[in-house]
Curated annotation (Swiss-Prot):
Mg(2+) 1 binds at residues 49, 69. Its cofactor is Mg(2+); Mn(2+). Its EC number is 3.6.1.52, 3.6.1.61. This is Diphosphoinositol polyphosphate phosphohydrolase 2. Its main location: cytoplasm. Transmembrane segments: none annotated. It holds the Pfam family NUDIX. The keyword Nucleotide-binding does not apply. The active site is at residue 68. It is found in: Cytoplasm. GO terms for cellular component: cytoplasm; nucleus.
Length: 179
């Protein structure tokens, strides 16, 4: 895990670390998703994301993280859900982003040699299932949600205290619970 010297972790009222991530799509059809290499395990692919900084909104944090980790900018779309990881005490706000700009060189490619690659959604799920099943759940949730073209949000607009939480499945493969 990369930790910047000036980085401050933020936590919610229940002690969960606040994180944000984006499923970055090549187009609004949402059929190809961008994954990045892990900073810890460069041969493994992950969904770009990281900690929410103080005074930062989760959507802004998600856009910042994909800029730093994947070198892309785009149109931030709907909140897919808030995914809870009990083991690591994280709550990750996962957004959909349609990529509009791809940088040739970006912060993490220069500093740590991070790579990025486009995957068909089904292939990305398979790749993520091996070592980052929580990230695969983001894409599974996307498939269960509405079609990207019908204009409906997969998550209703709710205040933080009533937000939709998807709890990560235990390694045994028990399905996620929604509370």
């Amino acid at each position: 895990m990369k930790f910047k010297p000036n980085q401050t972790r933020t936590y919610d009222r229940e002690g969960f670390k606040k994180r944000a991530a984006c499923l970055c799509f090549r187009s609004e059809q949402e059929d190809e998703v961008l994954l990045v290499s892990s900073s810890r395990y460069p041969d493994q692919w992950i969904v770009p994301g990281g900690g929410v900084e103080p005074e930062e909104e989760p959507g802004g944090a998600a856009a910042r993280e994909v800029y730093e980790e994947a070198g892309v900018k785009g149109k931030l779309g709907r909140l897919l859900g808030i995914f809870e990881n009990q083991d690591r005490k994280h709550r990750t706000y996962v957004y959909v982003l349609t990529v509009t700009e791809i940088l040739e060189d970006w912060e993490d490619s220069v500093n740590i040699g991070r790579k990025r690659e486009w995957f068909k959604v089904e292939d990305a799920i398979k790749v993520l299932q091996c070592h980052k099943p929580v990230h695969a759940e983001y894409l599974e949730r996307l498939k269960l949600g509405c079609s990207p073209t019908n204009g409906n949000s997969t998550v209703p607009s709710l205040p933080d205290n009533n937000a939709l939480f998807v709890t990560a499945a235990p390694p045994s493969g028990v399905p996620s619970s929604i509370r």
